[in-house]
Every structure is written in structure tokens, then in C-alpha cells.
């Protein structure tokens, strides 16, 4: 679905499909342009406020800061860039490997998930 990308409607928790290093990847948005992101002691912080976010709480990721991410020049996500994480900790083909994800590399957001069947979901 390209509507959210085209009209800058991508939000936290959205799963996006993007191109990086000649491959297509799927990851979840945890940080948007203008925000500061950090994971400390298994908790996600956005703009220095702790976020009740299930994507950081039970993860193997202990600490990560925006300034430590590849292609990041500071503590704030620049315009047109996103920070993403995969739902599986073992798959590090997300911002931990590629750094900031440029909007021009985003193909769209995932609006239908059908496998595994018990996690069937859709968005409109």
C-alpha cells in the first residue's frame, strides 16, 4: 500500500516493505522524522519519554541510541528518514544493520498479514 508513504502517513508500529542493498525487507517503524530514539534497559524511549511499546520490552536488544545508528549525524531523525526494527531479534536486517531508512527506498506499508494464520490481520 503506497498511500501512507505518498501522503506521509506512516506511523509507529507500521510494517513497511523497503529496498536496501538490492533486496526487499520488511520491518516495523519505531522512529519517524524529527524524533529522538533510544532503547535503554529493554525499554523504548521517544524524545526522552518512555513508550509503552511491546516491540522493545521483551527483546534481546538492551541498548541502542540513534547516534549509534549508521547514517545518523545526531540525536534526531532527519526529514525523510525512519528507524525500523524487525519483529525477530535474530534478523538484524533493519536499522541495526542498514541505519536510517530513506523514504525513497520504502515501497509501501503492509496492510494485510496472512501468515502465520493465527496472526491474520489487515489495515485500512
Which residues does each PLM region occupy?
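Soluble "head" domains of membrane/secretory-pathway proteins
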Residues: 1-124
